[in-house]
């Protein structure tokens, strides 16, 4: 898979599940962001629950929203 330029990947922990496959994630630096699941994770039916450790991609333009790209096992 090609890496995107300019995205920030950071680890975090899911603190709450919201409607429409959105999640509130607390990052390792203490910030809280709103994140949705990436298309590949949705396609492969990967479930995300509160307290899961995940990797979130953030855009440099809006650091309050992100995309969950990986869930640790």
Swiss-Prot record:
Gene Ontology MF terms in the entry: ribosome binding; rRNA binding; translation initiation factor activity
The segment(s) forming the S1-like domain are 1-73
Task: Give coiled-coil spans as residue ranges.
Answer: none
Its predominant location is: cytoplasm
Report one GO cellular component.
cytosol
Q: PANTHER family given for it?
A: TRANSLATION INITIATION FACTOR IF-1, CHLOROPLASTIC
List the HAMAP family hit by this protein, alphabetically.
IF_1
Name of this protein: Translation initiation factor IF-1
Protein's organism: Leifsonia xyli subsp. xyli (strain CTCB07)
């Amino acid at each position: 898979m090609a890496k995107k330029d300019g995205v920030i990947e950071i680890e975090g922990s899911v603190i709450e599940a919201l409607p429409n496959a959105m999640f509130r994630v607390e990052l390792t630096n203490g910030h809280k962001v709103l994140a949705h699941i990436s298309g590949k994770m949705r396609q492969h039916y990967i479930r995300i629950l509160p307290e899961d450790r995940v990797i979130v991609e953030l855009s440099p333009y809006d650091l309050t929203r992100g995309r969950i790209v990986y869930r640790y096992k």
